[in-house]
Amino acid sequence: VESIIKDVKGDYIYPSFIDLYSDYGLPKAKKGEYNYRPQYESNKNGAFHWNESIHPEINSAEQFVYNNKQATNYINSGFGVVLSHKQDGISRGTAVLVSLSDQKEQKTVINDKAASCFSFKKGVSMQKYPSSLMGSIALLKQLFLDAYWYQNSNNTTNLSFNAFNNQFDLPHVFETSLVTDYNRIYQISDEFEIDFIIKGNGKEYQRIEEIKSYEYPIILPLNFPLNYEINNPEESDILILSKLKHWETAPFNPRILSENGLNFCFTMSDLEKPSDFIKNLRTSIEKGLTKKDALHALTLAPATLINEENRLGTLEKGKKANFIICSSDIFENGKIYENWTNGIQNIVNEKTENDVRGYYTFTSENVSKTFTIT
């Protein structure tokens, strides 16, 4: 294998980051045509589950296609690998672990079945049921019961149950929309003796003692609320205290999880602007998250959660060539020069040949001025 030697004296090098909650490279789910008659049965042909929001047979790897625009957003923020799944329905099927390199899919797919994914969201299904959170929970519990029963059944074939039963050895990722979803997931986890990795919602601080007791690993978004613009007294009356409290406390959420000993990693999911990721990450550090914990949450923690710590997450011989080169400490004001994914160079910011950054003092007679070039 040919090697490349580069002089990066004075630069900072980190392992490329890993995002465990993405829909990168996958088509968006689309709703069917509206029918004024209520739909109670599945319109999906084949020996599948009777409800369209239950589709564990979906294998995201079979639908994955490289997407340059999405990949660029991730690469510019320091990511090299993402776990991608089709974010639709309650039982969503398997996620694919992929490199963000601009290569054929045969080269970028790292693990075609890296996790199975769940939520309480019905998705684009046009069936009447479920029509509530309670219905979604009941349907998911029934799926577990039916799949267990199916293991000993010889008189029927159900491809959804087949797929579901084959996923028990995979990591299980469960999306939350509300902070109260943690308890709902725990009830399912406890009843069916299954562990979950929780995709969080940024409000974990509100019930930290309860969440701490569950000991779930958490995929944490950095979707901090923007500043509220209040131009007159009437607008201030509309703004409720809970929103102001969340605006103030949300940036402390990673620190609070860390101080309570919870295992977590970061995701770009839920950000309106992908470019805000590094900015919000630095805000978390300003609010008390240590740089060591931040780096762990971006690299080795996610790699370990999906059992890929032998190939990803650190800069070691034998691991994939995924790393970023930065001008200085990325957790302060470092600029990403290059992001190498799968051994392929991606230029993020051009590096000037003559680096003129620094402090300069200009003296003229009795006047002395100091300037900073960053």
Where are the predicted features?
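His/Asp/Glu-enriched, well-ordered alpha-helical/loop segment
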Residues: R37-H49, E57, P171, P221-S328
